[in-house]
Curated annotation (Swiss-Prot):
InterPro entries: Aminotrans_V_dom, MoCF_Sase_C, MoCo_sulfurase, MOCOS_middle, PyrdxlP-dep_Trfase, PyrdxlP-dep_Trfase_major, PyrdxlP-dep_Trfase_small. The keyword Transferase applies. Residues 651-678 are annotated as: Disordered. Sulfurates the molybdenum cofactor. Sulfation of molybdenum is essential for xanthine dehydrogenase (XDH) and aldehyde oxidase (ADO) enzymes in which molybdenum cofactor is liganded by 1 oxygen and 1 sulfur atom in active form. The active site is at 401. Signal peptide: none annotated. This is Molybdenum cofactor sulfurase. The gene is hxB. Residues 656-834 form the MOSC domain. Residues 651-662 have a biased composition (Polar residues). The modification N6-(pyridoxal phosphate)lysine is found at residue 237. Belongs to the class-V pyridoxal-phosphate-dependent aminotransferase family. MOCOS subfamily. It holds the Pfam family MOSC. It comes from Emericella nidulans (strain FGSC A4 / ATCC 38163 / CBS 112.46 / NRRL 194 / M139) (Aspergillus nidulans). HAMAP family: MOCOS (MF_03050).
Length: 839
């Protein structure tokens, strides 16, 4: 495989038109989006889809295994496109064959399964930067495996192959380009291993994972001696569509598949089922013996339109390589230049010291990085990805399906990773920082249609949210003329959310409401669960859930549910009995043999699902998601709030009282069981959530002050004041005198009492509420914007967490043992806080 070192990077040089013109016509979905995840998949052009549509509507394609005219047309097109694909990679069809597979992983598995079927098994070696799918091959290697952690180890191993005389079968696999950080490893290894193999008895084959590489660079297999035995790739990485992969096989290495046992339709010439089982494999070509069943012939035909469109727009992969290298270098330089007010760097980039964006043989257009604040503390990857998402910037975070490369870059050992797993860390979760170090990486990857605007937008995003400015002082000083014991607060409003993540039911003024140990009566007792996965739905993924509005009719003992925007008269209504065993036809099917396992905020629970088709149809039709209503079971299986987490949050106040972490203290020994754990139903973290009206007002002042005139009409609309409803609090408190507002004073509360006299109830403050992008969903329209999360990220970030509101828990013994009622509260009740600094 040949790579050009000397080609100078240039912005869209050689393209058919300026890239911005191409974007406007071919990629209209990029109008309001900055897409920086081309290593995951690049984007398909409008004209590709239109061309494919014309092809399908203008031709009749049958199953290529039949002999009809339509079937033979399909077979002919598949053969032609197979040849076109080989030529796209400069692979001589006399020397190579191409097998269509679902994706690169399917190609890897095809090779691994064939080697596993050999009588003695095989040995496997892989490079540390390998994709997870390459790592997984080691589980099939009977003769053992080895992970090579640097180039010197590989070179040393290759040099020793010539002296080995024992006969053995092996496979060495590595990526042409790391999908984590774009590092490119030496292409000479394939040629060197083949040369050593000719001088020894061992049979070491080479497998090149080119999936990441081919998305922006030309794969050149014209030098046969240097080409891998097997090359895997995915076409959607290059064209965006179709979802199809390929395994390119050197014909001289095809004997590897002779021990393959499984056969599918289309891969055999004859099969006997009577008497002794026997079959004859097709021998005419490698691809005929490996492509089991009917090929995805429509997807293969779409590949023809993909080649045509890509060539027309970008002319060549060399042009794409030059364009993306130019942008990557510019982005790297600008990220390196970002500094906080105190001179410390913002971005930690993970690059090999031998890599350079000026050298196509050493580096591709991918940037892997993490961020630090001005105090040198790491910023969690999940927070960055969430904030980027609400600003319509698409990036990737995590271990990026590259466990070895990520661990090596972050300095994690295998023992470290096992400790993290024992502590609860899983792929895709938000355990961002452990042992005061990041557990994952942020990734930006560029593609053929990326532009300078994408670079400028991302840099502006970092400058706005992650480049610290000189501090202007800390909010919430307690003034000396305010009596801490004067009950100057009251309950402005009370709300319950009968169905988790759906609309609020505002408790009417003058109505006293029961408080139970698990929170306000009827709060988050129901939820919607996906009928396929069993996972509870939430507004982060389905913002229209805000328009599902429950009403509690206690007189008739009904939960009345309407769907649609506020004040809409078109919404449908569903009534559910509040009794667990009802007489209504919709509720008689509840609970009886209807237990359903589900996942709520990471907890495994068993819910009681409504089995009536009318119930599931009501919610499914509105959301467009197959779901049904479910109810949390009786208190015998109540979930509990994590006091360990609350204790950490509790110390994260503006006085910065938290103790420094003790080196080597992770993981901590399990804490003793809490004799009085705080019960919760389907709420995320605590029985009740409290916010302050004055804090909402201050936040809205910050939102408005940050607003600037903008040519984008949508941006101006997103900067309007937000309603308190977006925080989905149970209790909103306000000062008795509006002129005496003290924003964020609740951050200093240790506990509070609501009411007076015999009706007074006490609540402990468990900690601050960590916010996510769900607060950006307008609870009246179901539309998602970028506020208030964008402003909270600037004004309320405390030690990596964006905080607003307080988790509270009622204290006391139930007055009513049957329903666990501790007492009642109502709108207008006095609120008397106690403070952290009180003795």
């Amino acid at each position: 495989m040949n790579l050009s070192k000397g080609t100078a990077a240039a912005y869209c040089s050689g393209y058919s038109e300026d890239v911005d013109v191409i974007r406007e016509r071919e990629y209209p979905l990029l109008k309001d989006t900055t897409y920086l995840d081309h290593a995951g998949t690049t984007l398909y052009a409008n004209s590709l889809i239109h061309s494919f549509g014309r092809d399908l509507t203008g031709n009749l394609y049958g199953n290529p295994h039949s002999m009809s005219a339509s079937s033979q047309l399909s077979a002919q097109r598949v053969d032609d496109i197979r040849l076109r694909a080989l030529r796209f990679f400069n692979a001589d069809p006399d020397e190579f064959d191409l097998v269509f597979v679902a994706n690169a992983t399917a190609g890897i598995k095809l090779v691994a399964d064939a080697l596993q079927n050999s009588p003695q098994g095989f040995w496997y070696g892989y490079y540390v930067d390998a994709h997870t799918s390459l790592v997984g091959v080691r589980e099939l290697a009977k003769m053992g495996s080895r992970c090579f952690v640097n180039e010197d180890e590989v070179d040393s191993w290759i040099s020793g192959l010539g002296s080995r005389r024992e006969e053995s079968l092996g496979l060495f696999a590595y990526p042409a380009q790391s999908n984590m950080n774009g590092r490119r490893v030496p292409m000479r290894w394939c040629e060197q291993i083949r040369a050593q193999k000719e001088n020894a008895d061992n049979m070491i084959y080479t497998l090149l994972d080119a999936a990441s590489f081919v998305s922006t660079s030309p794969l050149d297999l014209s030098k046969i001696a240097a080409a891998p035995d097997f090359t895997v790739l995915s076409f959607y990485k290059i064209f965006g569509f179709p979802d199809l992969g390929a395994l390119i096989v050197r014909k001289s290495s095809g004997d590897v598949f002779k021990h393959r046992k499984f056969f599918g339709g289309g891969t055999v010439d004859m099969v006997l089922t009577d008497g002794n089982p026997w079959h004859a494999k097709k021998q005419s070509s490698i691809h005929q013996s490996l492509e089991d069943g009917t090929l995805p012939f429509h997807s293969i035909i779409a590949l023809d339109s993909a080649f045509e469109t890509h060539g027309r727009l970008f002319r060549s992969m060399e042009n794409v390589a030059s364009h993306t290298r130019f942008l990557a270098k510019r982005l790297r330089d600008r990220m390196n230049a970002l500094k906080h007010y105190n001179g410390t760097k913002v971005c930690q980039l993970y690059m090999s010291p031998n890599s350079s964006y000026d050298d196509a043989s050493s580096q591709g257009p991918i940037l892997a990085f993490n961020l630090r604040n001005s105090r040198g503390m790491w910023i969690g990857k999940s927070e960055v990805e969430r904030l980027a998402s609400i600003k319509n910037i698409q990036i990737r975070s995590g271990t990026l399906c590259n466990p070895g490369g990520t661990a090596l870059s972050l300095g994690w050992t295998g023992a470290d990773m096992l400790r993290h797993f024992s502590a609860g860390m899983r792929c895709g979760d938000d355990h961002d920082i452990m042992d005061e170090r990041p557990t994952g990486i942020l990734r930006i990857s560029l593609g053929a249609m990326s532009s300078l605007t994408d670079v400028d937008t991302f840099i502006a995003f970092l400058e706005e949210f992650y480049v610290d400015k000189p501090p202007e002082g800390l909010p919430v000083p307690l003034t000396g003329n305010v009596s801490l014991h004067q009950p100057s607060f009251y309950v402005e409003s009370l709300s319950v959310y009968p169905i988790k993540s759906c609309g609020a039911f505002r408790i009417p003024d003058g109505q006293r409401w029961e408080v139970r140990r698990e929170g306000l009566a009827w709060d988050r007792e129901w939820c919607l669960v996906h009928q396929g996965t069993g996972i509870t739905l939430n507004q982060k993924r389905y913002p229209r859930m805000a328009l599902i509005r429950p009403t509690l009719d206690l007189e008739r003992c009904l939960l009345r549910i309407t769907c649609g925007e506020a004040n809409s008269r078109d919404g449908k209504t569903l009534e559910i009995s509040l009794n667990r065993i009802g007489t209504n036809s919709l509720t008689t099917s509840l609970c009886q043999n209807a237990s359903k396992p589900s996942t709520v905020c990471g907890d495994k629970v068993v819910l009681q699902a409504y089995t009536s088709p009318a119930v599931s149809r009501f919610f499914t039709d509105f959301l467009g998601v197959p779901c049904t209503l479910a109810r949390f079971p009786p208190q015998s299986s109540t979930r509990f709030h994590s006091r360990a987490t609350a204790a950490i949050n509790r110390d994260q106040n503006y006085s910065q009282k938290q103790s420094p972490s003790m080196p080597g203290s992770f993981p901590q020994a399990p804490s003793s069981p809490d004799p009085y754990p705080t019960p919760i139903l389907l709420s995320n973290e605590s029985p009740l959530l409290l916010i302050s009206r004055s804090s909402v007002n201050r936040l809205n002042e910050s939102i408005k002050s940050a607003s600037q005139p903008c040519s984008n009409p949508g941006s101006a609309a997103s900067k309007k004041a937000v309603a308190a409803d977006v925080f989905r609090a149970n209790v909103v408190v306000a000062e008795n005198i509006s002129t005496a507002e003290r924003p964020y004073i609740e951050d200093t509360w240790a506990s509070l009492s609501i009411g007076s006299g015999p009706e007074q109830l006490r609540f402990d403050v468990l900690g601050s509420c960590e916010r996510c992008q769900m607060v950006c969903v307008d609870q009246y329209t179901g539309q998602r914007g970028d506020e208030p999360y964008a402003t909270l990220a600037k004004t309320r970030k405390i030690d990596r967490k964006i905080l607003f509101g307080r988790h509270i828990s009622p204290v006391g013994r139930p007055k009513d043992a049957e329903n666990g009622c501790l007492g009642t509260i109502m709108v207008g009740d006095a609120v008397t806080p106690s403070y952290d600094n009180e003795s």
